[in-house]
Amino acid sequence: MSIKITTLVENSVYGKGLQGEHGLSLLVDTGGHRLLFDTGASDLFIRNARMLGIDLKNVDFLVLSHGHRDHTGGLHHFLQVNQKAEVVCKKELFIPKFKEERENGVMHPDALDSTRFRFVDEVTELCPSVFVFPRLAIADEEDTHFEHFFTLAGGNKQADTFTDELALVLKQGDEVSVLSACSHRGITNIIRVVQEYFPQTPLKLVLGGFHIRNTAKEKFDVIARFFENHLPQRLGVCHCTGIDKYALFHQCFGDRAFYNYTGRVEIL
């Protein structure tokens, strides 16, 4: 069974007629089910989908990786064009979020149709071959990305440790692929959690943002050292990873590393 991943929104774009924005939205098509992983920052994912001939009315699940606006900003727009999909996320998604002094969480959560939401707190198989991993334990504190981010608790700001973050995992035979939108809790930590659940299962694809753009090279080095022993067949970086860090990944791992831009299609 093949799985098709189409990038509806990413920071960069190369195809005519498509647009990019600071955000991420991936469409996963298993042949039997369609899942949207995040919505980007606006309704752009809908407009790009239309340009690509994709009808989002047929999406079965919307999975939200975490509450930041560049991943949930299109949520209201999606609920207007799609009347059937479950919205899968963690309850913590709606905790008010800030980047420094700027609000950066889900917009107007009180206006959302709560009957469409499915909150998960354990590994959940949404449909054959597709799993949500909502508990992302941190084994290596060096690969965490919490700086400048805050939440509100009892009216007081506190550091955001991204307890709302989850990952999407695709299981095909004896291989797994990991999709992680921003990896605030660390892509190496996320992969460790997946490998504990599926022991001795090779990595086919790791795809997403690693949140090391505009960070010191030491943050990249932590991830690169991990991949020296856990390198997937395909390593797709994008969004908050940064073009400069992609270049370093390509230097280290050659053509197994690629940049995942708006409009790109990956077939598994």
Where are these regions (language model features)?
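Structural motif
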Residues: 3-6, 34-35, 85-86, 129-131, ...
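Conserved beta-strand hairpin/beta-sheet module of binuclear metal-dependent hydrolase folds
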Residues: 3-52, 161, 165-180
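Metallo-beta-lactamase
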Residues: 92-166, 253, 258-268
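A short, polar/proline- and glycine-enriched secondary-structure boundary/capping micro-motif
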Residues: 46-51, 143-144, 188-192
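Short, small-residue-enriched loops and turns at beta-alpha junctions
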Residues: 13-16, 156, 212-216
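Cap/insert and terminal regions of metallo-dependent hydrolase folds
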Residues: 68-71, 161-178, 182-262
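Active-site metal-binding loops of divalent metal-dependent hydrolases
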Residues: 10-12, 39-42, 67, 92-93, ...
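Active-site metal-binding motif and surrounding structural segment of the metallo-beta-lactamase
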Residues: 44-92, 198-205, 231
